[in-house]
Regions:
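Periplasmic c-type cytochrome electron-transfer domains
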Residues: 1-426
Length: 426
């Protein structure tokens, strides 16, 4: 079998069809900001960060995707800018993936941490008297088995996902009750202050169904953008106003770095995170291939087997958006292959991190559209092998255990290849 076969990229990142001229202009302003490399003085980069631009993480197969292969932007960022002042942790390699590191427990070894510990630091600033920064001791934490990783989630079609009403998600969930596969699941409802770490940070989650991030920890694209800007690049903003560095001697600016600019005109009024969210909101989903890999007949058979084996109970083929003021997002079928709910994935995939109502073993069903171009699989990018990623779902205690063990694994080799071809066509 060839589980790692993917067709050539079908098309670059593009806006949704049906957008108006002003909406296209907003999309273009957003993608420009998404691609921009932020700087320390001009933008407030750091003093702790993982990279210096959104597009560095979300790069494959194009802007808005996930971790690129072959040349890890974190490795490149270190070599070009930070070799004299930073150590490169052994889990950041040239071949990738891009990684975010979180510690499961605090230094006392008992209480939960769960927060992001940025890989790189900015040092040597002339106006930073008294500020002494050190990188986390990743080697020690790795020995303690206290480090877990996350890779970037793709944001293709994210505006369509944002427009799916809560009730549609709940109604779809209700159809699973009493199924013979052991699939349960639940939605993640998060209130302000509990999506990032245990620390209070009034970030806009308001008790509606959250749906973005590996654990569905963010309710909206604006919250998703604000958190990422703060956590991955150290840039405070109107939603996440607290610097990632807690030492008061390293608090260089008492107000957020990124804000709305009422003294400007046109789109320049908008904050960076508003532009990021607009780009993601208007970014089109991938177009599936009708014939690659394996041919149209194989893909068609694989799609039917995907449903028959129970995979589609979590990876729901389609949900529908509600009414939107943006016609391109209103009343659309969204072929995302996700129910946007949390599911218990068992011990093999558990990461020891809770976010909102999501426990250490629960993850949002990852949308499968765009899978044909994905290189790294699962939340931590542990494998490039699609079939292994499927097998990881049969972890003891996983809701998907029976689906994989009793249904997928009993397919013939030819049938399994059809399923893989279908997945790689998405």
């Amino acid at each position: 079998m060839t589980p790692d076969l993917a067709p050539d990229p079908l098309e670059p990142a593009k806006p949704l069809g049906g957008l108006t001229g002003p909406q296209i202009n907003l999309f273009n302003a957003g993608i420009a900001e998404f691609n921009k490399r932020d700087e320390v003085k001009a933008d407030g980069l750091g003093p702790r960060m993982n990279l210096d631009s959104c597009a560095s993480c979300h790069a494959h197969p194009d802007v808005g995707g996930t971790s690129p292969p072959d040349l890890n932007p974190q490795f490149d960022f270190y070599e070009k800018n930070l070799q004299k002042t930073n150590r490169l942790p052994r889990f950041i390699t040239k071949a990738g993936p891009v990684r975010e590191a979180r510690f499961k427990l605090n230094p006392d070894g008992r209480t939960p941490d769960g927060g992001v510990h940025s890989i790189f630091i900015i040092t040597g600033l002339k106006d930073a008297d008294g500020c002494v920064l050190q990188q986390p001791d990743f080697a020690r934490q790795l020995r303690r088995k206290n480090v877990i990783f996350r890779i970037p989630t793709p944001v293709f079609g994210a505006g369509l996902i944002e427009q799916i009403p809560d009730q549609v998600i709940l109604d779809n969930h209700a159809t699973k009750r009493g199924n013979a596969y052991g699939i349960r699941g639940r939605v993640n409802i998060i209130n302000a202050g509990h999506a990032l770490t245990a620390r209070e940070n009034r970030n806009g989650n308001d008790g509606t169904i959250a749906r973005f991030g590996w654990k569905a920890q963010n309710k909206s694209l604006l919250v998703f953008a604000g958190e990422a800007y703060n956590v991955e690049m150290g840039i405070s903003n109107e939603l996440f106003q607290t610097e990632r560095e807690e030492d008061p001697k390293c608090q260089f600016k008492p107000t957020p770095n990124d804000t709305t600019k009422p003294d400007q005109t046109g789109l320049d009024v908008l904050s960076d995170i508003e532009k990021f969210s607009a780009f993601m909101r208007f970014l089109a989903p991938p177009t599936p291939s009708q014939a690659e890999p394996g041919g149209a007949d194989s893909i068609s058979r694989g799609k039917k087997l995907f449903v028959k084996t129970g995979c589609a109970l979590c990876h729901a083929p389609s949900l529908r958006t509600g009414t939107s003021t943006v016609a391109a997002l209103s009343a659309k079928e969204v072929d995302l292959y996700s129910d946007l709910a949390l599911h218990d994935m068992g011990d093999w995939l558990a990461d020891g991190i809770s976010q909102g109502q999501a426990t250490s073993r629960e993850f949002r069903t990852a949308p499968l559209w765009g899978l044909g171009q994905r290189i790294f699989f699962l939340h931590d990018g542990r494998t490039r092998d699609l079939k292994r990623a499927i097998q990881e779902h049969r972890s003891p205690g996983s809701e998907a255990n029976r689906v994989v063990r009793q249904f997928f694994n009993r397919l013939t080799q030819s049938q399994q290849q059809d399923v893989l071809n279908f997945l790689r066509s998405l």
